[in-house]
Regions:
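Active-site-proximal polar cores
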Residues: 647
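A C-terminal, polar beta->alpha supersecondary segment
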Residues: 260, 268-283, 656-680
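Bacterial N-terminal signal peptides
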Residues: 10-18
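Bacterial N-terminal signal peptides that target proteins for export
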Residues: 1-9
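Glycine-rich (often Gly-Gly/Gly-Pro-rich) flexible segments and glycine-rich loop motifs
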Residues: 222-229, 241, 245, 257-261, ...
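Extracytoplasmic/periplasmic ligand-capture domains
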Residues: 4-5, 14, 22-25, 30, ...
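N-terminal lobe/hinge region of extracytoplasmic solute-binding protein
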Residues: 74-132, 298
Length: 680
């Protein structure tokens, strides 16, 4: 090619010489520009003339983004897991690790939260293959043979059945076990303790072991009858209490991770004896983490847990003997992971996380707040829509990050009000504990006027513009858009300082006026979550502007400490979030009205009874139109009672180095599924 270019250039020069010899001489210098296919500009003096031959510019070579270490992935987050016990962990930091170190019977078909592929089961049960009975009450799973746990022991059907039996019997209202007890033991049964005697010992780890031994054995045997292993035929059968449409989705999450019975027993867990299960009931994460059961993992998954140093890092190593030989979906991974080491670093300050990402020392980070998006955009060179396969350059195409945006999420952050603040052992979050200007009484939020005032005093528009940067959608209901029961025109509270003042002036405690006395309390959030911090600060600003004696102190707590105080009902009000476990409205109304959040908020019995009737009816109703009407009733009562200040929904954003490949979004999947990913 170079010889050809030289020949063309030479002919052009000769032609110019001939023309120059024939033409009359001119006093001025004539410049003729000829663009040819060459590699540089050449100036040639011929007969007093300069002939400039200009090369066609070569295209600028695109900047390459290559990782200095494609075998190691560094994710920088804020906050630790609560525990690694699969039966108890119920938060994203832990669940994301569990789904990498363990396997479930079935798993999501990549992005789809309602379509499933076999994992430790050899097929997904259905009516067509006989895995689901005609009445919808019996689910039979064929268990995969030849799978080994990380310690080299063999997976058996007995391990599978034991995993679910142990989970339900260990129970605990702070655990995810309600997702299994409802379909297997009966709608509305949120904890196995409710079946023991009159149910009064449910949630009480001290009282339940003292219940009648025969009654305890009866409940244990009932639970065991609901999940039965057949080691000869390599099957496990679940017997449901009533048809339950979202049963398969329930098994695909982290609490469906299959454990070794032998390892659990050796690591401080229950051994399967119905005479002793009560001694392991609702232990709490602190007790579990003092044992290998909660501080380590031992599953069949694509990664093994090398170490967890709380407050510092989690390190995962590839399972080089991972059993998968066929991809779960088209183009999916098989065998050992491509990324050999995953390091999840715990760094509270966003500025430090950002600097690590900018320097290339991190592959991705948890941002912490939508308000930090503009700073992230400064170092973003490529913008992708929904997936990493639909991308275009940004205004700064040489920058190192890739932004994946506009993908749907199934989570929300709201403000939860505590009706009966726990003062046992003292409680600094409510100051003096009295309505004296230096605190609040423990029943502060039982007053409907106080709750409505707080809802009216929150500046929703400021939150949308300053924190969500205009990208949020106001949600009038806890049920998500597109679900049965969502109402776009449902009533909701809006920012109205006049109504806030009107309501708070009606609030009294023992004849003392809240407006006259003032108050002081603490709003808690998990440290590093700047979005939740700002929510608190907005409420703080608006209330103090209304009355300088209204003091809301916004306090950050490390994630495990925050969880413990939230679960113990110590916090008078909290900013917290929920990501759905299964894509169904029941998974929203249950925790918000009678489940996890409602218990932490100590909703009064008459209110929870009213909600429970609606929630239980909605769970079993099969007619979509009738089910929607039930949830419309729920929406109105939730608005009237205002136990929670409902905020906005936001589409997702993920920032990562441009050498990262293979990430996908499944809106119910916690954490990052590194097994499908690789680095260039």
């Amino acid at each position: 090619m170079r010889n050809k270019l030289f020949l063309v250039a030479s002919l052009l020069i000769i032609a110019s010489m001939v023309l120059g010899a024939c033409a009359a001489p001119a006093p001025e210098k004539v410049v003729e520009t000829v663009t040819v296919e060459t590699v540089k500009t050449v100036e040639v003096q011929v007969g007093g003339e300069t002939v400039v031959v200009t090369a066609t510019p070569e295209p600028v070579k695109a900047k390459e983004f290559k990782s200095p270490d494609p075998t190691t992935y560094v994710q920088v987050v804020f906050g630790d897991p609560d525990t690694f016990d699969v039966a108890f962990d119920y938060e994203n930091a832990g669940l994301g690790v569990l789904l990498l170190t363990y396997d479930t019977l079935i798993f999501y078909n990549k992005e789809d939260p309602n379509d499933f592929v076999p994992q430790l089961a050899t097929e997904v049960p259905g009516l067509e293959n006989g895995g689901i009975s005609a009445d919808g009450l019996t689910f039979t799973f064929k268990i995969r043979q030849g799978v080994k746990f990380h310690d080299g022991s063999d997976l058996t059907p007995e391990d599978v059945a034991f995993t679910f039996q142990r989970g339900m019997l260990q129970g605990g209202y702070d655990s995810p076990q309600w997702l299994l007890t409802e379909p297997l033991l009966g709608v509305g049964i949120s904890d196995v303790g409710e079946l023991v005697g009159d149910g009064s010992a449910a949630g009480d780890r001290e009282a339940l072991p003292g219940m009648d031994p025969a009654e305890l054995v009866r409940v244990c045997e009932l639970v065991k009858s609901k999940v039965v292993a057949d080691n000869d035929n390599w099957t496990v059968t679940f017997q449901l209490a009533q048809p339950w449409a979202p049963f398969l989705p329930t098994l695909a999450q982290g609490w469906g991770s299959i454990q070794s019975k032998a390892w659990v027993t050796a690591s401080g867990g229950w051994d399967g004896d119905c005479a002793t299960w009560q001694n392991f009931y609702d232990p709490g994460s602190e007790a579990l983490n003092a044992l290998p059961l909660g501080s380590t993992t031992m599953g069949t998954g694509p990664y093994t847990l090398e170490r967890w140093v709380p407050g510092e890092e989690i390190v995962l190593k590839a399972n080089e003997n991972y059993w998968r030989t066929e991809p779960a979906w088209e183009g999916g991974p098989t065998g050992a992971p491509k990324i050999k080491t995953i390091i999840i670093k715990n760094v509270t300050e966003f500025s430090t996380r950002y600097a690590m990402l900018q320097a290339g020392d991190a592959d991705s980070i948890n941002v912490g707040s939508t308000a930090d998006w503009p700073q992230m955009d400064v170092i973003t060179g490529q913008i992708c829509h929904n997936t990493d396969e639909d991308c275009e350059p940004s205004e700064k195409p040489d920058e190192p990050l890739e932004l994946i945006r506009d993908y749907p999420t199934a989570n929300r952050t709201d403000i939860f009000l505590n009706f009966a603040i726990n003062t046992e052992g003292g409680n600094n979050f409510i100051g003096s504990g009295q309505l004296d200007g230096n605190g609040v009484p423990s029943n502060f939020f039982t007053n409907i006027h106080v709750r409505k005032a707080f809802a009216y005093c929150f500046n929703y528009d400021a939150y949308l513009e300053q924190v969500l940067l205009g990208e949020g959608v106001r949600s009038p209901t806890v049920i998500l858009p597109g679900m049965i029961g969502y109402q776009e025109d449902a009533p909701m509270y809006n920012y109205d300082p006049a109504k806030c003042e009107e309501e708070i002036k009606q609030a009294e405690f023992d004849g003392a006026s809240v407006w006259d006395m003032g108050f002081r309390l603490t709003l808690g959030y998990n440290t590093g979550n700047d979005q939740r911090q700002t929510i608190g600060q907005i409420l703080q600003t608006e209330l103090s502007a209304l009355n300088e004696n209204f003091v809301v102190e916004v306090t950050g707590l490390p994630w495990p400490t925050y969880l413990r105080n939230f679960r113990a009902s110590k916090l008078p009000l909290s900013t917290s979030g929920w990501i759905e476990d299964i894509d169904d409205p029941h998974n929203w109304v249950q925790p918000y009205a009678i489940g996890n959040f409602a218990r932490r908020q100590n909703l009064p019995e008459d209110v929870t009874a009213q909600f429970k009737s609606i929630v239980d009816r909605g769970a079993v109703e099969v007619d979509p139109a009738k089910r929607a009407e039930i949830y419309y009733e729920f929406n109105q009562i939730y608005y009237d009672q205002v136990p929670t200040i409902i905020l906005y929904l936001v589409n997702g954003r993920r920032y990562e180095q441009r050498w990262v490949q293979g990430w996908f979004n499944n809106r119910v999947l916690p954490g990052t599924f590194y097994y499908s990913m690789w680095k260039e």
